[in-house]
Amino acid sequence: YAKECALKLGVQPLGYIPSDSLLHIESRHLGLVGADEIKSFDEKLEHLADVMEKTVDIDAVIKLAKTAEKIEYEAEKDVGTDSKSCVNIAIAKDEAFCFLYDDNIAFLEENGCRIMYFSPIHDSEIPHDADGVIFWGGYPERYAKELSENKSMIKSVKKVIDSGIACIAECGGFLYLHSYLEGTDGKKYPMAGIIDGEAVNGKRLQRFGYMEVTPVSDGMACKCMQPLK
């Protein structure tokens, strides 16, 4: 029926993907589970390819895609750098912090940064020659006990950030910098303590959408009292 409706509307059906238990992927708050957590992930992809070869007109999809107009754009500002020296950026990366953005990392490298990865779970300290540190997202609440027990890393995080070097923390990384983080077991674990507060799991979805904030001091991405959305 869907095909007939599409044809009546002048839309050419390109295919479909049937419901298939072998293609099911578990989800979690914030999205799907990581590829490294899925058993037989490669086999699922192979099965998906086999299914789509039978139910999707791949040649028609490619032909249609080639008719799309080229997107013309200009960057609003070319940041660039005149610095001849190398800047070392330490990025948290492990089971707890797995939401990394390749484009951002490539941008940093193209602008004179040397990327150094460290694990808040397994390593004892942030690389000593770091000029800046980034804590991106992930699921620290799933590893709250392990993160809390790594006292030497927490001490290093406090020392480095208190020294005044640039630090960016978002999502799970932002939670890690709080005084306490509620784990998936419902217990509250001591964290880095940079931010005086507790990060807890709400019982329902809080909100999506934009917020307006007014910075009370200058920062890397803001000016004091200049509203942001």
Task: Pin down the residues of each PLM region.
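Short acidic, glycine/serine/threonine-rich loops at helix termini
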Residues: 1-3, 25-31, 102-104, 179-180, ...
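Internal gly/pro-rich beta-alpha loop/helix module
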Residues: 1-79
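Short, ordered loop/turn segments at secondary-structure junctions
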Residues: 18-22, 120-123, 138, 172-173
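Phosphate-binding active sites in nucleotide-utilizing proteins
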Residues: 79-80, 87-151, 155-160
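C-terminal and late-domain segments of enzyme folds
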Residues: 82-85, 97-116, 201-204, 208-229
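Cysteine-nucleophile active-site neighborhood
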Residues: 140-221
